[in-house]
Amino acid sequence: MAENHCELLPPAPSGLGAGLGGGLCRRCSAGMGALAQRPGGVSKWVRLNVGGTYFLTTRQTLCRDPKSFLYRLCQADPDLDSDKDETGAYLIDRDPTYFGPVLNYLRHGKLVINKDLAEEGVLEEAEFYNITSLIKLVKDKIRERDSRISQMPVKHVYRVLQCQEEELTQMVSTMSDGWKFEQLVSIGSSYNYGNEDQAEFLCVVSKELHNTPYGTTSEPSEKAKILQERGSRM
């Protein structure tokens, strides 16, 4: 008797969709898709195509919130305009990176956000999918974060810049990125052959930096770096 051999699919792209194809053969994967579309078949599994990344989850997970977009999607709401791709996955034009925390919240009821993701981004997705409990949870998390940052000590960074009189106006007028003028000290004049004496000044500037669990709230911009470099030439 001839043996049947499965041709394994390559692993799916990275993200929460990983594992969707890897480990399944082409024939078995196609069979699962066909069964999911048959009446009385394996209909508890739902495939989503979010911004080009595939997610596989259960209908029960997506139906956690009866008022959500995903619940209506599973109920085949006629008022909901939804398309499917060639694999039968529901097409959702959203950021797949931020869909991960939303889907995991529906799975186990806990909000887990990687440190490289912004709470505001998760909130935007929660509002799009209309998941009421998640919206409240993320808003509370944002308020706690802002309150924690406001209570952290503020560091003042000072820089001393040396410049001539003709450079002073331009330097002060172009200062930005949080740098503030503090003090101007005259240090006399320098003599240039063939030119008149040039008055020289020390310009003291400062900037506030708020500490956060992941460092300061902002990295120095190009203009701030220029100020630092000029100050270091003294």
Curated annotation (Swiss-Prot):
Its main location: cytoplasm. GO terms for cellular component: cytosol; nucleus. Residues 44-146 form the BTB domain. One of its GO terms (biological process) is protein homooligomerization. It is found in: Cytoplasm, Cytosol; Cytoplasm; Nucleus. Signal peptide: none annotated. Homopentamer. Interacts (via C-terminus) with GRASP55/GORASP2. Interacts with CUL3 and with ubiquitinated proteins. Interacts with CRY1. This is BTB/POZ domain-containing protein KCTD5. It comes from Mus musculus.
